[in-house]
Amino acid sequence: MKICCAQMNMRLGDTDYNFNHAKELFEKAVKAEPDTIVFPETWNTGFFPRDNLYGLCDIDGKRTKELFGALAKLHGVNTVAGSVSNIKKGKIYNTSYIFNRHGECVAEYDKTHLFTPMNENDFYEKGSCLTSFELDGKMCGIIICYDLRFPELTRTLTVKNRLDCLFVVSQWPDKRISQLDTLLKARATENQMYVICCNSCGKAYNTVFGGHSAVYSPLGEAIAFAGENEEIISAECDEGISARIANEINVFRDRREELYDVKSN
């Protein structure tokens, strides 16, 4: 399975430019003949315009589905369409849509952990469900940016579905970029799966986004790694490596669930 990540520099609040630019990056990425293309978090609006966010949002993913559904079908490529600022039932969500090779939307996910230090929770509604899906017979999960800091979320997904890979779409800032690298490596290692992150780059307000999109193997090794600027990276994923690792160290067999039911008061 070959993966491409389109590390995109979007313009804050300029949705027409961002949709056109996303199409341009997709058409560049398909030249590498990938099985799956991945985009970053809230690429349609940037993260995030505070003055007129509601007026800039997609509505029920219509524009996103039209663009990526058509591109995925035309080129026969699975697409993890990052996430978009999106209105559903009158409320704004940070929503990810996933498309198969036929252009069909096979899954969607609303970000469950909103980033309170940047007041995301004042503008967006939090999601309430986890999402897993199949692409080319491989079980996949998706999380969005701040979700990565909650290992319980990823472990719940992997225990329920034994994921082959986890997609992480993000707008992670430069000043904490080393933490992104560490957390991605940890999630891949502890869950014995591929972790594919597509981060953004560029600047919004006073925040610089740090790039470092990457593909980590189930051994925790970076097999593709981006710099700080806009670029497309690609990696070939060895489909048998997770099984080989599990034969040596089977962390899922050796789990002790009776010890893990910890709830705060």
Report each predicted region and the residues it spans.
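Short polar catalytic/cofactor-binding loops
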Residues: 7-13
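Cys-nucleophile CN-hydrolase/nitrilase-fold catalytic domain and related Cys-dependent amidase chemistry
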Residues: 15, 24-102, 108, 173-186, ...
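Active-site catalytic loop in hydrolytic enzyme cores
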Residues: 60, 87-164, 173-182, 244-251, ...
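C-terminal beta-strand edge segments of enzyme domains
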Residues: 108, 132, 200-265
